[in-house]
Amino acid sequence: MPQQVHIAQPLTAARSRGLSGRLRPPADRLIGVMALMLAAAARGDTVLEGLGEGADDRAAIEALRAMGVAIGLTDDGHKVSGLGALGLLEPRAMLDFSAAATPLWLTLGLVAPHSFASRFAGSDLPPTG
C-alpha cells in the first residue's frame, strides 16, 4: 500500500528575476553542449568561455544556428544570442548530427515543445542502451 504524504501548507513558486554571474564547470563535452542548449533557450546574450571545438560542439552550434540562434566567436568566448524558451525557428533543412549523439539527443528535447516540423539525421551513432 502506498504511503500517504501530508503537506502542512501549500507549496508555491515565484518567478525568478534571472541568473547572472560566472560559473566554471570542469571541461567536458556534455557540459559544453548543455551550456549551448541552455544559452539558446535563454532570452538574451550568454558568453561561453572555454567551449571545445570537437564534433559535438560543432554539431550543436550548427543545429542551433539552423533554428535562428546567433552564435559568434568573440575575444571572451562564444556569444550565444538566445531566443527564449519557445523562440526557436523551424529549420529549413534536415539537422545533420553525423556521429554526434549527445547534441542530437539534447536537441530533440529542446525542440519537443515547439509546433514546427523538424528532421534529424545521424550516422554511426552509438547505441542508446
Please tell me what each predicted stretch does.
Residues 1-129:
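Short, structured segments at the rim of ligand-binding sites
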